[in-house]
Curated annotation (Swiss-Prot):
It is a lipid-anchor. The keyword Lipoprotein applies. The gene is ynfC. InterPro entries: UPF0257. Keywords: Cell membrane, Lipoprotein, Membrane, Palmitate, Signal. A lipid is attached at residue 17 (N-palmitoyl cysteine). Disulfide bonds: none annotated. It comes from Escherichia coli O6:H1 (strain CFT073 / ATCC 700928 / UPEC). Belongs to the UPF0257 family. One of its GO terms (cellular component) is plasma membrane. A lipid is attached at residue 17 (S-diacylglycerol cysteine). It is found in: Cell membrane. This is UPF0257 lipoprotein YnfC.
Length: 236
């Protein structure tokens, strides 16, 4: 047995053998886009992905698909929200994301490929020194975002008129299982909901299958909904 291990040990020393390196951190673009477009962030050299949310009856309620460059920029992003009857399809063109059908300029970018402005809604984004979006503002609202040391989104606080909505997420202490998390939602400091998610992961530490439990505590009795999330991911 010892002799059989020698070739691989030697290969590890010389070339690293044939193993996948796990990237534990999230890029500023991936983390920030996941905040704004409401999907689970992914790690590593993602080439394209599709994230599908299904209800307890197996019906698709939401789907997010994206393609990324080797540098981690979103070349395209498509969102299908059946619950709200919304479809958004964006394609990268220099410093803008254009509508995939009308080619209208929808989102202005800053830096390499980070969010800067949504002109039609009067929304502008601010980034920190590391390139993560930490603020979004318009005439009607102010939003602040939080991240941990690995760039994982820890939640956001939205202020609009006399209302403050805060979402705080607590991920697993296992750095591989960041998408196993709990979250609490507060409206004007009153708890109105909670979320729990647990996942199975691939060898890039990205979620493949997840169960998402959402509890609406703003109604009495509280209403619990259970969803399944399926991820299809291709890598460079």
């Amino acid at each position: 047995m010892k002799y059989k291990l020698l070739p691989c040990l030697l290969a590890i020393l010389l070339t690293g053998c044939d193993r996948t390196e796990v990237t534990l951190s999230f890029t500023p673009e991936m983390a920030s886009f996941s905040n704004e477009f409401d999907f689970d962030p992914l790690r590593g050299p993602v080439k394209d992905f599709t994230q599908t949310l299904m209800d307890e009856q197996g019906e698709v309620t939401k789907r997010v698909s994206g393609t990324l460059s080797e540098e981690g920029c979103f070349d395209s992003l498509e969102l299908l929200d059946l619950e709200n009857n919304t479809v958004v399809a964006l394609v990268l063109d220099a410093n803008y994301y254009r509508d995939a059908e009308t080619l209208e300029k929808r989102v202005r970018l800053q830096g390499k490929c980070q969010l800067a402005e949504l002109p039609s809604a009067g929304v502008s984004w601010e980034t920190d020194d590391n390139g993560f979006v930490i603020k979004a503002s318009s005439k009607q609202m102010q939003m602040e975002y939080r991240y941990d040391d690995q760039g994982y989104p820890l939640g956001k606080t939205t202020k609009s008129n006399d209302k403050t909505l805060s979402v705080s997420a607590t991920p697993s202490t296992d750095p591989i299982k960041k998408l196993d998390y709990t979250a609490v939602t507060l409206l004007n400091n009153q708890r109105v909901g909670n979320v729990k998610q647990s996942c199975e992961y691939d060898n890039h530490a990205n979620p493949v299958d997840c169960q998402l439990i959402i509890v609406d505590e703003g109604v009495k009795p509280a209403v619990e909904r259970v969803y399944t999330i399926k991820n299809t991911i291709d890598y460079y």
